[in-house]
Amino acid sequence: MTETIYSGLKQLGGATLLPESPDKAELERVRNPQADVAYNVRFTAPEFTSLCPMTGQPDFAHLVIDYVPGEWLVESKSLKLYLGSFRNHGAFHEDCTVSIGRRLAGFLAPRWLRIGGYWYPRGGMPIDVFWQTGPMPEGVWIPDQDVPPYRGRG
C-alpha cells in the first residue's frame, strides 16, 4: 500500500467511541500539503457542552477556532471527538476555552491560532472567552467570528 499523508490515522473512516475525558482524547494530524501558503482554517462548534465543576449542570457554548497552519492540519474527526469529550468534563468556561486553544497550538505548532468561546448564560450572564497565540498574521484573510452578543429573548 502506498504511504499517503493520511497513513497512520486511527479514527477516520471507522466507528470510534467518544473519549471519556479531554485528557484521554487523541488528537490526530496530517501533513499540510499547502504548507508553503498562509491561509486560515476555521472550525465552528455551535453545540459545545461541558459541565459546571461546582454543580455538575451542563454548560453550553458556541466555539469558533481559527488557525493558520504550518506543517500540520488537525484531522477533523479527532477534533470533533476531542471537543465531544468535554461533555462529561467539569471545568469553568475560561479553563475549557483556553485549554482547547493551548492543546491545539501545542499539538499543531500553527503559525497562529485563536479560539472564541461564546458561552450561553448561567446565572443570567453570558461569559465570552478569547485566546490567541499572538498577533494576527498579515496578508491572511481571517474573517470576524460574527457570533452576535447574547440578547436573550429581546
UniProtKB/Swiss-Prot annotation:
Main EC class the enzyme belongs to: oxidoreductase
GO cellular component: cytoplasm
Residues forming the catalytic site: C52 (thioimide intermediate), D59 (proton donor)
Pfam short name (any one): QueF
Protein localization: Cytoplasm
Catalytically driven reaction(s): 7-aminomethyl-7-carbaguanine + 2 NADP(+) = 7-cyano-7-deazaguanine + 2 NADPH + 3 H(+)
Biochemical pathway: tRNA modification; tRNA-queuosine biosynthesis
Gene Ontology biological-process annotations: queuosine biosynthetic process; tRNA modification
Source organism superkingdom: Bacteria
GO MF assignments: preQ1 synthase activity
Keyword terms, alphabetized: Cytoplasm, NADP, Oxidoreductase, Queuosine biosynthesis
Gene3D superfamilies recorded: 3.30.1130.10
EC numbers: 1.7.1.13
Binding site for substrate: V74, E75, S76, H93, E94
Function of the protein: Catalyzes the NADPH-dependent reduction of 7-cyano-7-deazaguanine (preQ0) to 7-aminomethyl-7-deazaguanine (preQ1).
PANTHER family linked to this entry: NADPH-DEPENDENT 7-CYANO-7-DEAZAGUANINE REDUCTASE (PTHR34354:SF1)
Assigned protein family: Belongs to the GTP cyclohydrolase I family. QueF type 1 subfamily.
Name listed for the protein in its UniProt record: NADPH-dependent 7-cyano-7-deazaguanine reductase
Species this protein is from: Paracoccus denitrificans (strain Pd 1222)
Lineage: Bacteria, Pseudomonadati, Pseudomonadota, Alphaproteobacteria, Rhodobacterales
